[in-house]
Every structure is written in C-alpha cells, then in structure tokens.
C-alpha cells in the first residue's frame, strides 16, 4: 500500500482537475477550472474511437479487495454509472488524464494515445538527461532520503546510521573541497608512482614499472583493478553454490561501441578533448598532453577492438571457460598469474594449485598479450593514471566539475549539474559498480533500513506477493498451452517457474541493528576527507566481496536483497529469483486504494516482466537451481530460437526518429521478450481476478472499459522523454528499447489489445504478422 501522509487540510492539496472531478461527483464529462478547463474539456468531450460493450463479469458485490465506489456496481463495466469517486480514484484519474492524448487513434499509435500530452507538455530539467514515470517516483524518494540523511544523529546512535550522514556532510562541504582543489587525487597519485604526463622524464627512471604492480597499488588505494583485466569474484555458472575468480576483458571509460569507430565517432573526439583538458587542469603541458594522451587513447581503442561486443556476450556458455593457474600460465605467460591474483585477494586468501578460474573471453587474453608487448610502458601508465584521475574529477573543485559537465553534455545532453544535495544523497546511498560486486551497496543498506521503517507499509508486501502468485499461475497455464515445447522441457520449465524465489520490499534482517552493526563494523568515514573516505568505502566493498571466495553461496543472503530505496525490479538467473524493492511499490506502479486494472497494468506488468526474464534468451540458459545447463530438447530449442528471431527482427526494424538509428534487436531481445510476456501474463491475471470479484468501476472522466484502462496503465508505465544524446547512447549501448517501442512493440503483438480497442486487422497496432515467444 502506498504511504499516505495524513493532512487535515485535504482540499487545499487537490489540483484543479481533482477539485472539479470531486465537485462533479458522478458526472463523467466535467469542466475544469481556469487554465486547465479547455484542455480537459477537450479530453472529456472526446469519446474513445471505439466504445465496445465489456464482457460481463461474475459478481457485483464489493469485497475487501475492491475499491469502494460512489455508486453500487451494476455488473457491467461499460455502464457509465459505475464511477469510483474516492480520493485515490480522483487523484489517479487526474494523473492518467494529464498524460493521455485521447484524440489520437489508439489503433494507430497507442504510445501517443497513452502519453501524448505528457510528451508535449513535460520538459526535461536542465540537470537531467530524461524524465519518465520512474524518475517521478525516484525524485520523491530522493527527497525522502535527504530528510533521513540530514537528520541529526547524536553519537549515541549506532554507527551504521551515522555513516551516511558523515559522508553526506563531507560531500556538502564545498568550502573545503574548493580549498583543496586537485590535492586529494594528486597526493594519492604521487604515492602510487605518479602520472607520467605530470612527472615528466623523472617517471620510471629505474625502468622497474609494470602494469601488474600498478594494478596491485590501485587495489590497495581503493581504485578499480579492471583497467587492463577485469578481476572479480563471481559465482560458478555451472555450480551456483560455489564462487570462483573470474577474469574478463577490461573495463573501458567510453563504451566499446563508440571506441571501435575511432575518430569517426564524435563522442570519441569529445572524450579525447576531455582527457587533454583535464590533464591540463592537473598541471600538464597542453601540447605534451595532446601527444601522450592520443597514444593512450589509441591503446584504449585497441583494448576495445580485442573485446567482445555485447551481442556475443549473451551466450553464457561462451563466457564459461575454466582454467587452472598452470593452464593460465602456459597460455598467457605475460602475467605471473598466481602472484598477481594473490596480491589482489585479501590477506589470508591464496590461489590454490587446483583452483578453477573462469576466463570469460579467452581470445581477449591472447590478443592482450600481443597488445601489451608492442605498447610502451609509458603509454600504458598514462592510460591507467588518466583513468584514476578521470574517476576523481567529481570529487574535486568546481573548475574540474565544470569541464566534466561539458563532457557530460556531449555524452548525454545534460545541461547543468544537478543540485549539490541531490548528488550528495546519491553518493551517500548508492553503490559504486565500478569496483564492487552487485551484492555490495555501500551505505544504501543503512539508509534503506531507515527508509522502510518510515515510508513502507508492510501490507504492500502481501498485496504484491498475491499478484506474483496470480501472474505465476498464468505463466504456468501458458506453458500448458504452448504447442512447440516437448513434455520434458515443459516439465523442467514449470519446475523452474514454481521454484522461482520472490523478494518483496526488503529483508527483515535490515531492521536488525546487530546485523547492521556487524556488517558496517570495519567501515569508517571522516567528514573532513571526502575523497579518501570514498576510496575507503571502495576498499571495504571490495574486501567484502573478495572475502566470500571460499564461502558457499547463500542465495537468500539478506545483503543481496537489501536495496529497498530504488525504483526498479530484478531477476537473477543464478538465484532463479525475482526482486521488487520497496521503492517501486508506490506511485504509478501500485496503490491498494485504486482499481485493480491500474495495478495489474503497472506493477503487474513489471512482475510478469521479471518472471519472464527467467525464460528469455539469457535466463533460459539456466536451470531451476540457477546453474548454466542445457535443459532444452533440440527441437524445442529450435522452435524457441525461431520465435526469438521474430522479436529480434521486429524491434531491429524500428527506427527512432530523433536520432535516425535502428534499434539493436539482438541486444534488446531479452528485455523485449520480457515485455511481451509480462504484459500478456498480467492482462490474463487481471481478467481472472475480475471474473472472480466482479466488474470494477471506471475512473471519473475516463469512459473506457476496465480492459482498456489496463492497457492505458501499461502504456503509461513507459511515458518518457529523452535528450537526443541520451537516446543515442541508450540505443547504441543499452539492453532496453526506448520507451516508445517498448509500448508499440509489445502491445501490437497482443491479440487481446486489438480486441479491446477494436483495432482493424492490418492497422499499426494490429499487424497481421505478430511475434510471440510466451
């Protein structure tokens, strides 16, 4: 249930639309107050293009699961007398109407129909690269987190609740940050051997420098270890109860998709200019910086060119290549592997002779040896030190941050830096993915504990779990109905489906002070040392992750699911689990006090999406226990791949107008399969709920059937506006289709959508040829 802050002065908090709808009571077509009246009058005078009679549903009595209405249900959802006039229904109607453009024919472009006014009237703030249904909730959540973090916490309070406050204060101390200038990073860099570009000819005078030793020093100091070789502790894909060392291709500062194009790509040019300008701010000679950093950039381009593209990394079996230390040494002798790995592991952990190490992309390591052999040490060192200096810029004084903003503008279109308090809230609550495993969330666990205690209603867990079970049952029945699966594969799919663990809201352990105290025992933050404290957090997180190497994987570990204050949802192939944090169980996505068609169209869609991820092109590679295993009969797999190919080609043929770019059907196929399956499953689940509980009332001012409103809620889930630069990046590097195509692609494949809106066969939203995986 959405958190509602009680306020006796309720009327003053209503907007004009809500006041008008309330005063009008049962009147479906209302006239709003000045400023909004003409627009809404137009909306309310415009009948939907088709107004079919809804299917009669069983039962007309109000149950505890139904929203109370202003009039008794007559048992026919198309009856305009059934209107919900509660406070929450009026607010919901207002929100829906502000986004819709009902004069658009839904069978032509449902995204414009559901989100057209939102797209025309909403403006992207200068400090953002996009706005969306998600960002509205995230902004509200950010303000709630600010209140939590800025609250005074005396020394008597547990340390784990004071740590976020200390980091926030360090971040907000702009006076000290400006006074220090570049000193925080230059002091550390000098201790690490110095940036050759800055040190000049005195660098490496004894010719003893090696990139391996530099990586070890970076690890000790709290920087990333992944600039040459990505080193992490992961889960054994074929035995997900064990952990192992995972070696992968290097982490790049600019996406591979851009770097491989060289200077033909404008963003590569922007990146190069940024490198040079930042180096000059640190004291480098500009001409020398241009020369030396060009060589370093060419080295990074070479790293990109020997790396695998995302399209090739979707097959997990291709990324699973176990080697012993001896095999590594024989194949890639340019690194003393045992010494290298031991130096990166925490004290007390050492690589055994029979240790099985996963080499994600063997061809990368073969090519890397050749690249390193022909690249001068100074070029490699300049590149590595550029990376840590580039990482540090956001923690430094304003002259550095202004140049960073210019680069961000080229990259994503952002026009201004966000308010300092927003940045500091994010720093104090978010994980650093660059150096920490996914199950480490810096101070987000501490802040999340305070957040759920103050803002999350426990009833929301039960409501969401009920929907999960209903939608899971629908997927089970879909498996029964598909005619392209053999019986054995279908049985395994059902077993995987019903074994899928569900994590909703937050783990109870988050509220246990003893567990929190133990988790944060080794972490300290100095409010007068912002950058150093952040590096300390990185060391803490890396040690936490690496110390798990010899420990069995606990798939229900509370720490892995202790990220409640985010607006997102997750599926884990290795856990075979779905997760819905507290942050998404509110706002557009869920409210127990509004009609169910709105909840099924929003959070129900998300639930179905995450369940379906277990059976998308990547999730299907893992079995019921989360192990990488081929459990598909060859004929069934062939049929699946043909269906997935239809999705790939459908989305790959979409062209985004603003950028002129075609979508990447391969990289987005997993999300697209999940969208298509998720909305179908949730729709069927809603129809079953309605058959059991009877018809639901309409929302005031919205003369649509409950089924049509389900689709409106689903479409408005993806209302979003992007800056052109951000959209280009999303299409080029992302796994999600732009919002417009998430709606058009999935709903145009739905026969029920076409039926509910009476779309003629062959219309844009009811093509003759449809794609369907599940």
Curated annotation (Swiss-Prot):
* CDD domains named in the record: M13
Q: Which family does it belong to?
A: Belongs to the peptidase M13 family.
Major site of localization recorded for this protein: membrane
The relationship between pH and activity is given as: Optimum pH is 7-7.5 at 35 degrees Celsius.
Q: What would be one Gene Ontology cellular-component term for the protein? A: membrane
InterPro entries per the UniProt record, alphabetical:
MetalloPept_cat_dom_sf, Peptidase_M13, Peptidase_M13_C, Peptidase_M13_dom_2, Peptidase_M13_N
EC number of this enzyme: 3.4.24.11
Which SUPFAM superfamilies does this UniProt record tie to the protein?
Metalloproteases ('zincins'), catalytic domain (SSF55486)
Protein keywords: Cell membrane, Disulfide bond, Glycoprotein, Hydrolase, Membrane, Metal-binding, Metalloprotease, Protease, Secreted, Signal-anchor, Transmembrane, Transmembrane helix, Zinc
- Transmembrane portions of the chain: 21-41
Which species is the source of this protein?
Answer: Drosophila melanogaster (Fruit fly)
**Listed Polar residues bias regions:** 60-74
- Topological category with respect to the lipid bilayer: Single-pass type II membrane protein
What is the purpose of this protein? Metalloendoprotease which cleaves peptides such as tachykinin peptide TK-2 at the amino side of hydrophobic residues. Functions in female fertility, embryogenesis and memory formation. Required in females for normal patterns of egg laying, probably due to its function in sperm retention and preventing sperm displacement by rival ejaculates. Also required for normal patterns of hatching due to its important role in early embryonic development. Required in the dorsal paired medial neurons for the proper formation of middle-term memory.
Q: Which residues are glycosylated?
A: 173, 239, 264, 305, 315, 358, 554, 653
Protein name per its UniProtKB record: Neprilysin-2
